[in-house]
Design a protein with these regions (language model features):
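Short glycine/proline-enriched coil/turn segments at helix->beta-strand junctions
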Residues: 40-45, 50-51, 63-64, 120-124, ...
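Acidic/histidine-rich catalytic neighborhood of metal-dependent amide-processing enzymes
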Residues: 109-175, 179
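N-terminal helical capping/dimerization or prosegment-like subdomains
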Residues: 1-78, 240-244, 258-261, 335-339, ...
């Protein structure tokens, strides 16, 4: 049996075991226990950081650049339209069904096998493996908690499902709480100041404004009003109109820059829940990106968020599976996609 097949078989067995254990964000403990034990059984030395698992076996006198291999343990909650048990791994021909199989169990187990492979084969990088928690909710006990425990990282691969095409840029995210203020009064007497009417100009601006800097990889920065709450009953003029705005920033802006601009344009009060989920980009001339192109891959920009947003070092997403299957009913990954991923990673790192 060839090496790729052996590692693929191990990856699929591990993924099946992980699917059997519910690991919704903030409840990954049992899945992390299993993964930690399997890593020990492989003869490696994992370190637990809450529900994150770090494998860092570098030598202090090694001068090679350090590459982080990262993917997440946690899943979203299963949607109601599943026609299978989401926690029963099912193989049907080439498809492995189960919650988290595609997002991003395939990347999680594939990158671990690649780490194992390079324990006994030459690699131009020193590899560090991190299975992170709470990625789906950008939680405080996920990648952010593990980040200070990492060594100095030169570049990272994030194993999100990209069809094994390199996502070299990723949009950032801000969620804004926007509040228009008025003054309550009796609706029958035209008293007060209607906060809904006060919000109309701001709503119109949010709908129509187009940011000038358009990324060739990620397109424009986008704003969408997704939630509105106002009023308590029909005969009371509302004194507050509260809106939620979803902002997806391209890599030509920082979140802080966009927030300050929006605040300067709106009459309403604008507060960001967080600005830490920044857009990211790796230089297309980076050796790792060039190696991807040599192997026939096509770099692209990704609109979806990952732990890449929290990485203060060059990174790109590259993993088995398809983003379109993520968070969907009857989620699956192809066993052949896992095998292909392991083979491609090894080819990339052997000659980067």
């Amino acid at each position: 049996m060839n090496t790729i097949q052996t590692y693929t078989d191990d990856a699929v067995r591990l993924l099946q075991s992980l699917i059997r254990i519910p690991s919704v964000s903030r409840d990954e403990g049992r899945a992390a226990d299993l993964l930690e034990q399997v890593i020990r059984d492989y003869g490696l030395s994992p370190r637990r950081i809450c529900h994150n698992i770090l494998v860092d076996e570098r030598s202090d006198d090694d001068s090679r650049p350090v590459m982080l291999l990262n993917a997440h343990i946690d899943t979203v909650k299963p949607v109601s339209s599943w026609t299978r048990d989401p926690f029963t791994p099912t193989l049907a021909d080439d498809r492995l069904y189960g919650l988290g199989s595609n997002d991003c169990g395939g990347g999680l187990v594939s990158l671990l096998q690649v780490y194992r492979y390079f324990k006994t084969h030459e690699c131009p990088y020193q590899l560090v493996y991190l299975a992170s928690a709470e990625e789906e909710v950008s939680g405080a006990n996920g990648f952010s908690l593990a980040l200070p425990q990492l060594p100095k990282i030169d570049v990272a691969i994030v194993g999100e499902p990209t069809g094994m095409q390199p996502a070299i840029a990723e949009k950032g995210l801000m969620v804004l709480d926007v509040t228009a203020h008025g003054q309550s009064g009796h609706a029958a007497r035209q008293e007060g100041v209607n906060a809904i009417y006060e919000a109309l100009d701001d709503l119109n601006w949010l709908r129509r404004y187009r940011f000038e800097r358009v990324s060739p990889l990620l397109g424009p920065t986008l704003m969408n009003v997704t939630v509105i709450h106002a009023g308590t009953q029909h005969n009371v003029v509302p004194d507050r109109c509260e809106m939620t705005v979803d902002v997806r920033t391209n890599e030509l802006y920082t979140n802080d820059e966009v927030l300050a601009f929006i605040q300067s344009q709106l009459h309403s009060e604008v507060k960001a829940r967080s600005t830490r989920l920044q857009p990211s980009r790796i230089d297309p001339a980076h050796p790792l990106v060039r190696r991807c192109v040599e192997l026939g891959m096509t770099p692209f920009g990704s609109p979806t968020l990952s732990d890449q947003a929290l990485m203060p070092f060059p990174s790109m997403k590259l993993g088995p599976g398809q983003s379109s299957r993520s968070h969907s009913a009857d989620e699956y990954i192809l066993v052949s996609e896992i095998a292909h991923a392991i083979e491609v990673y090894i080819r990339m790192f052997e000659k980067s």
